[in-house]
Amino acid sequence: DPYLEDEGTIWLIHWLLASNSKLATSIFWFFNNFHKQEFTQDEALLSLVDFVSQDISKPVSGNTLKQDIGVLLRMYGRSTSGNKGIVEEALDSPLVLLQLVSSSTTGKAYKSSPTDRKNLPIEIFGYALVELMNSLDLNQIPINELMNTEDNTVAIGTSFRLTEDALISKLE
């Protein structure tokens, strides 16, 4: 799918980013460790700073983390700039189609809430499940560990922002 015409390809790209703590730390953190459903950019930044200070041995600039949050929100959230300004700044990322992050009704906050994600192809969900189990070297995994993570590992439920019912439905 060289032109990203299949929504499944975009879901796969999201999974590859959200499950990679080494190369996509901010995205991994957001989808696996940040569980606040409505938040401001500043709240997200404070949480990321806390996560990085606990998990990364090298010091990271606050400006770098602020830029990371801005990039993440632009990658996953629909542009609000309308037709003003530079055309490239008004273009949305393909990841916006997944509707994993949206602006709140006030416009000053963001939302990232679990839903049923009917547009998540079962093939991508299955691939993510097999990859997770292979990476953990497991033949079985409890549903609660698929839903949430407590030890900075990947959780399919939070990575795809699924409700518990949606996760169980996809497993069936």
Residue ranges with predicted function:
Residues 1-172:
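Donor-sugar nucleotide-binding helix/loop cap in glycosyltransferases
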